[in-house]
Amino acid sequence: MTRSILQSARRIIVKVGSSLVTNEGSGLDRQVLGGWAGQISRLKKMGKEVVLVSSGAVAEGMQRLGWKTRPAALYELQAAAAVGQMDLAQAYADCFSEYKLLTAQILLTHDDLSSRKRYLNARSTILTLLNLDIVPIINENDTVVSDEIRFGDNDNLAALVANLIEAEVLVILTDQEGLFTGDPRKHADATLISEISVSDPHIETMAGGTSSGIGRGGMQSKVMAARRAARSGAHTVIASGRVENVLVRLANGEAIGTSLLADMPVKVARKLWLADHLQVRGSVVLDDGASRALLSGGKSLLPIGVVEVRGNFERGEAISCLNTSGREIARGLANYSARESHKIMRRPSSQIEAVLGYVGEYELVHRDNLVIL
């Protein structure tokens, strides 16, 4: 089932672990990075949008600093990340330039995705980069996060990015073949699971530990990441990054690794999240034309269609869209605060900059962040 979905998927998150970008922990393997760039270039030629979540900054920093073992102290890890992140970003930029592709570095913290305003900003930035045919390369901003609020590992970060931009598929590449019925290093009869639902209660007991001393995430974290990605409807494939041309072969529908299936499609999951899981902070009243546009045309909500703003909401918070009779017809994420919305309501989008002095978005609520009730 997922093989065909992977073939038809337009937006893919690819996560590569430290063991797949370093030379056994002794710094970045630029030849390997070039291989990932080449495969992603081929995926893009197939019409796919690809976001790369890459580990490797700490490992590269350790090599630069001459450290043989991964430090336990957070401040030392942050120092290694600060040293290594520059080399990681430059190495990827050089590799992708061989295929005439631009890259963009994005460093995220948990606060960026828990704050509604910063969540919306991060989402808009990544989607804009994809529209510009640029490859976003994402990592956790290790240099500033505290141990209590870190993502935990890049498996979890990749899943959250899948949630953020509604990716259809998350591909987690590791140094293991996939999910087995047991730890193959301990159980000779363990077999590779080709396909399983993320809601299967047995998958956590099947997950083993990490096989590398360089990274942080073991199979357990990959299963948890798959479950998190499934909340927004994304399927996950866990496969070995050692398989030749693994990304291209997966995109062509070849059965490699383990597919963990989400229980609902991306669009359905997104609509349920918008409708049921966000606290509404305010509302806007729409004129008849705007109401018709939302209900029948699948349009975004523009400021010109708003006749009244109620409540005190901020950018990125959920608001209700009411018709002139006061009935809620839609719900979505506001691109502007209540104060800003009041200033630009009843005005064409072309006047937003003149009124506010800047333009965040041309829509008050974008259709991708809107659900009809």
Curated annotation (Swiss-Prot):
GO BP: any one term: L-proline biosynthetic process
Q: Which Pfam families match?
A: AA_kinase, PUA
Per the UniProt record, which EC number(s) apply here? 2.7.2.11
What residues does the PUA domain cover? Answer: 281-359
Gene3D superfamilies named in the record: Acetylglutamate kinase-like (3.40.1160.10), PUA domain (2.30.130.10)
Please give the pathway this protein is involved in: Amino-acid biosynthesis; L-proline biosynthesis; L-glutamate 5-semialdehyde from L-glutamate: step 1/2
Lineage top rank: taxon: Bacteria
Location in the cell? Cytoplasm
Instruction: Detail which positions bind ATP.
Output: K15, T174, D175
Q: Which GO terms describe its molecular function?
A: ATP binding; glutamate 5-kinase activity; RNA binding
Task: Identify its protein family.
Answer: Belongs to the glutamate 5-kinase family.
* NCBIfam families linked to this entry: proB
User: What's the protein name?
Assistant: Glutamate 5-kinase
Q: What is the lineage of its organism?
A: Bacteria, Pseudomonadati, Pseudomonadota, Betaproteobacteria, Nitrosomonadales
